[in-house]
Amino acid sequence: MASEHIWQRIWLGLVLAGSLVTLAAAPLPITEGDTALLGHIARNILQSGEWLTLHYQVGWIVDKPPLTFWLMALSLHAIGDNPVALRGWQLLMSLLLVVVTYRIARLHAGREESLLAALLLVTFFQVFLQATLPGQDVALALFLALAFYDWLHYRRSARPAAAASAGMWVALAVLTKGPIGLVVFILVAAADAIVARRTRAADQAWRWGHVLLGVATFAIVAIPWFAYGYLRQGFPFVDTFLLGGAIGFGRSLQPQIAEALPLWQALLAYVPLLALGMLPWTGVLPAAAQEGWRTLRVGPPALRLCVLWATVYFVLISLSLTDKVFRYLLLVYPPIAVVGARALIVGFNEPRRLRVPAVVTLGIGLPVMAGGIWMMAMRFPQEVAIYLPLVLPFAVTLALSMVAFAVLTLWRPGRAPLALLAAGTMLSFSLLTWVLMTRWEPLWPWQRVAAVVHRHHSPPTTVVIFREKIDLPGYYIRVPLTNIDDVSVLSRAWRGGRTLVLLRNQDLALLPASPPHRMLATMPSGWVLVVND
């Protein structure tokens, strides 16, 4: 018993340490365009005072619901225009998701198992990654987790307050990312009710009056913003937010970012991505799947719901014909953490079972990590020399931690190798944060370049970025930016008047010889800013 209490303190300490590692990522510089895009939209909310119809640029309507933009705008207003304001609110949401995952596990499990569920979630690679990249997915996962938590409470007690609060959380999920929040909740709740009925589980039957209360609460919270959008914009709003666009039902019928994959590839695309996102705990997945299958027949309701939550959502996104996007997987990690923690507790009682995660870590986890780095190198060959040194300290530390876990578990299975792996993972996350904090801005000094642009810009000067999206530089450069991909269009712009151009150093030869260019700024990442005067 004393040993069990000691390990509970160790798991709690590791969860708290993982939370601090997550929060330490708040001051990270902006490293990708989506964060800059969201920040630009939130900034426009504050500047225009328009909180209901959101804009990116004049005339460009945002095709996402408003909740996360509101949160970011409030954060910018409260603490200023800086990276902490851009992502701090989401880091807090990510940690709230860890707490809710712990509470869901606590409905059926002891303290140690629940702490293990929280520890798995806070150290999953993709959960840490997505927490640092502001967007809709962390908020969606949090609100649906809260909805399922209240659903479980309702199935236990049949209290109307639980039905109403579940409806409220689903409404917030819809205000975060559209109909997908409602679809996922209905499918998982329906599957849970069907399985409970078939297995004659002792769950409380719902009452239709309580269901109507939940639906009414959902409608009161979710509908007003959508009704306002329809009244102001008409059918194009319905088409964008409900039928097609980026989040409507039609989005699931065809890809919008890349070409459609062959059917067999589309169906299996998320399998390797899940193995990658679960690092360093990929080895736990087979044991979690085995425990999940057993749970469907004889397990407690909360654990059963987590199995159905992970399974239904994973099947849903796998069958969807839309783009296979890594971040869409985020919603499966809370239930996988809960089921994975149960599998680990079973392994503590039967230590030989822990050898399977060790073998899978060596045979699948490490190759998946190496394959992920190799695929990124193949996809972005020009950037390998820039980004690989940033990633290597993290990757090497994580790989060594996984090897140490596997070797120690094969030698003497138990809790200690798991604690070592969790600590090593946090060290690798900390190294990644430190490297990005110290080395990113010297490579990409966008603030310095923006200052140069502002100093040399005066109407009617044109500012062009060649063969690159404008979102990230556009966050810092406060004058209109034009994106050009075609060399002939670039040549016409260059000869048509005073022009500032951001482009890669190797693309300088594509500029016309007349008028000659003058160098205004260079970046170690290989980009330059030139002007034609």
Predicted segment positions?
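Transmembrane-helix signature of polytopic, membrane-embedded enzymes
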Residues: 7-16, 101-123
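Short acidic/glycine- and proline-prone juxtamembrane loop motifs at membrane-interface regions
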Residues: 126-140
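Specific aromatic-rich, kink-prone transmembrane helix
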Residues: 139-156, 169, 335-339
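Transmembrane-helix motifs of polytopic, lipid-linked glycan transferases
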Residues: 88-108, 146
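Membrane-interface transmembrane helices that cradle and orient dolichyl/undecaprenyl
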Residues: 112, 147-165, 173, 344-347
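Transmembrane-lumen/periplasm boundary regions of multi-pass, lipid-linked membrane glycan transferases
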Residues: 40-41, 176, 181-327, 335-343, ...
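Extracytosolic helix-loop segments that constitute the early lumenal/periplasmic catalytic or substrate-binding loops
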Residues: 19-20, 37-60, 67-70, 74, ...
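Membrane-embedded architecture of ER/inner-membrane glycosylation machinery
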Residues: 2, 7, 164, 168, ...
